[in-house]
Every structure is written in structure tokens, then in C-alpha cells.
């Protein structure tokens, strides 16, 4: 669609040239003596009178959160007009306040006290960021969520959303300075709040024409920016900014103690993917010990043979087990102790005791949880899934999970159940199709199948066959997908047999995109994607988040499985402690193996040099909290209980950090066996 342009006469006016009608903005400023208006405008004149915006046209249908003005939309749901969300911009008389925050200010039409909660590092202003002309520390805007709940004013930290806020502020100031009528187009009515004019001077016609054309240009720019996909390019600005902020935070954290240095190194090497255009991080990360050089012809030949062998066979796929149910499928897929019913009734809750479920199901927690979730959602009937075939697949899937302390089928069951609860958020219940829900729960169930108990970096450093096969890129995640779909090729396991070819392709694409998002090195990118999407909608004044495109939906689904994979610190403290003990034991076993192979021991993997309490506080502060904070903003008022539990768990570990570095409790061989 060609861009709209102003008329030739008004373009001449805008340029300040042509005939006697030329009237540039410098002339306008001089003619209106704006400095006098700024100096003499009273508080009442510069205050904001809030009015509700016009509803957006029903381009897509919408889902309403009970008690909230926040909606997510998809083509499958019904449309509801949005509630009031008012927009306030700083007047020229309050420029100092605006400059201090770095942008526009949107506020809900109603205000009430909010429960104070600690904010993550993303909201901390930095002098370093202020000095960079391309980065703005913070702007402020209202939540896209409920007025009744008093979600209050939120800081805008992603660059794309700050750009929208700044342009909306410019638009509002233009209307106030020129005193022209706002656009009658309902799409633009929510971009500026009505307020008393700065003056009552009748401007020359050419000035009015110029102002109208400028307003039209701004509206066109905002139209394009507000509809742009925030999934990648613009969110990469936020990702780069968040990396810089996290590096700065972790450099301070590292200075606090020796254990702080190790925790910081671990967080950087695990949760931050490496960008070639990024400056080197402030914390010196130990150089990984590399394997033998691959420059020689003999070595290249060996690697080529290994790669060929790996490509010819998907490792880890063992002989499939025959069905054990004889056609009759028990209530939970397999025979379980009667007491399991109490725990299975809590599958809709955040944090059922999955360890107890595993015990009462005779070590079939993944089968009983996944089977029950799909049955509860009526997906057996929707997709004509044969229950016996599904159980056969799930039992073989469990069989292909290794006996690791952490990355085992109990963890997979926990992630699948967490996905189910996240999908139950009122804002999401009508957004995703049944096929997308099926794929999401399946992705949670298979996301770590045949995990060896070692990290991607270890596999790369040790020249593991999988690293060679997948070219060091998301090595484990690609392997999990290969094994999961290889199992589906057996006719006894293909519970998707009644799906159409198109449905199978869609299912496979969703699962692949989701499981690849469980690569922890993608954390900052996933956080930036989600944060940018949420904040862009706030600034745009839209209380409707459109999810009618695949990229928008998969962005939310990828965030969900990443949330579920990092959900341990948000669960009841007893479960959190058990998961923490398990992951630490797995890390230590990797450290033992690295020591045996002569590799440098990875951060947090030296069993004789780990401060558990401080590592968990750092993990929550810099990884888990910012992610869940952003998610809670998206699904508000849902997930507030999750944030509260996360805060309680943080305080539990914080209170147990030894005060003196020299008396810090470190884990030793004796501690391991206590």
C-alpha cells in the first residue's frame, strides 16, 4: 500500500518555502512566543484531562479477562469492545518530568493502591545507558491490564516501546501547540488525551494545513509501527540492551564474593547466547578447554566419518516396548495406587507434588500426567486419538528418558503440567486452537528425552558425536526432537494417525519451534521478545493483543515452555528444594567428568566450591524473576500468586546466605551424603 502524502500546497508550507504562504516551524515558534506560554501556563492548564479512547475496529475477535480490560485475540474467539484505557502525555510545561523518565506517560482511568512488589533489574536506570544516544533507560506507561485491580503505572524499558511512547508524546504536543482538531479517525482517538489548549491564537491557514499534514504523517508512522511484528528485529534492540544491563548487574554481583563470581560466570555462560557484534563482557569467563585441533587433514577425515555415522542413525533410540495394557486402558493410562487420585485432582494447580505422583504411579509420572491432561482437555475425541496407542507412545517415551538426577521423565511431567496451567490463564483460554494446545503439552513432555545429563557446552567441548551432528547449535534440543519424532514413526506409537497431513505438519512445526526454545542460551532473546510485545501494546494504548499470526502465537508458546522449564523456583519451597538438590547433583557429576577428561570445570559444577544459597538468589534475581514478571504483566491479574511464591522462595534462600565470605557454607563431599 503506497504511503499517504500531504498535498503539494501543504508540503510547501511544511518546507517553509514557496510564495508568501511559507511558514516554517521556527516562524511558528517565534510567532506564538511559545516560551511565554511555557513560562506562564498554570498547573491546571498543563494537567491532563483523561478521556477514554475509542474502541479499535474489530479486525480480529477478542477474549476478555474477567475483571480486566486486557484481551488477547485470535480468529477463533468472539470480539468484545475494550474497556477504558486512557493516555496522558506530558505538557510542554512539564517537560522536566518527561525528560526525567525518558518518555510518555500512560495511566489507567482509575487508580488504586497496589501491592508493592520488588521489581527486577530491567527497571533500573543506568548512567551508562543514558550516555548511549541509541538507548533510553526507562519511560513510563500504564499497564495493559485491569483498572479495577489497580495494576498501576509501569516503566517502559524496551527501546521499541519507548520509540512509540516518544512519538505519541510528539503527536500530543503538536496538537496542543497548534490547537488543531484531533483526528476523527477512531483508530487514532486513543493516541492523545484532551486537555486545555496552550493558547487561543488563531493561526494562519498555511500553519494549520502544515500542522494537519504533520499530524497525518505522524499517524501514518504510528500506524506502521504499531502493526509491525515485534517478534524479532525490534525485540533484538531490547535483547542487546538487556544483555548490557545484565552484564553490569552481574559484574557488581561478582564483586560481592568469590561465590558471586562463580554464579555470575554460570549465568552468563548458560543463559546468554553469544553475539558477534556485542562487546566483550565485563566478567572474565574462563576459556573453555578445546578439543584437538580440527585443522589437520587426518582430523577432518575422522570428524567427517563420525558425522556420517551420526547422520545415518539417530542415537538413543532403543527397541520399542510392546503395549502392556492388552487393549484395556486404566483411568490414568497405567495401573496406579488408589491414593494417586488426590494428587491428580491438583493438576490444574501450580505445583502439585509430581514426585508423589511418580511414586504412586510406579515410576510412570510422565505417562499418567500427559494422558490425564489430554483426556481432561477432550483431545482424544477431537483428534480421534486411540488411548492405547497414546499410552504405548508415552511408555516408550519414558523408557527413552535416562536415569538422570534432574533431566528425567519426572522433570518432563512437571514441565508438561506447568504448560497446562499456563495455558489455563483466562487471557489465553480461547486464543490457541486444539491442535496448538496438543502440540504445546506434547512439547513439554518430550523436550528433554534422552538427555545425557550434560550441558550443550560440555558436548561441544568434548567433541561429542551429537555436537558434530548438529554443528554445535542447540545440540541437545535438536536431539530431543529427533528422538521424539522417531518414536512416532512406529505404528504402535503413532497416536496422531488420524490427523490430516496438514495438521501433522503444523503440529510438527509448533513442537520443533517450542523445543528449540528450551535452549537456555536463548533466554535473553525470549525475554526481549516477550517484553517488547507486552510493552509495545501498552504504549500503543491497545488493550487488545492480537495473536492472529503464527509468529505471534509461537512467540507466546515459546515463552510458555521456557517459563515451564524454569518454573522450579516458583513452586512450593519443598518442591523447589528437591529440584535444586537434583540439578546440583547433575552439575557436580558433569564437573567430575570434566576433571577426569582434563577439561576446565564449568561454573557451578565443582562440588567442592559451590554456595547453593547465593546461587539461587542470583538465579532468581537475574533470570527467573524478570521472565515471570513479564509474563505476569501479559496475563494480569493471573500469575500474581506465582510471583508471590517466587518472592517467598527467594527470601528463604536469601536468609540463609552466610554473612561473611570466609564462613560461607560450601558444599563438600560430606554434605552430599547428609
From Swiss-Prot:
Its EC number is 3.1.4.53. One of its GO terms (molecular function) is 3',5'-cyclic-GMP phosphodiesterase activity. Residues 39-62 have a biased composition (Low complexity). Residues 66-78 have a biased composition (Polar residues). SUPFAM superfamilies: HD-domain/PDEase-like. Residues 1-82 are annotated as: Disordered. Binds 2 divalent metal cations per subunit. Site 1 may preferentially bind zinc ions, while site 2 has a preference for magnesium and/or manganese ions. GO terms for biological process: adenylate cyclase-inhibiting G protein-coupled receptor signaling pathway; cAMP catabolic process; cAMP-mediated signaling; negative regulation of adenylate cyclase-activating G protein-coupled receptor signaling pathway; negative regulation of locomotion; sleep. A divalent metal cation 1 binds at residues 411, 447-448, 565. Residues 15-24 have a biased composition (Gly residues). One of its GO terms (cellular component) is synapse. This is Probable 3',5'-cyclic-AMP phosphodiesterase pde-4.
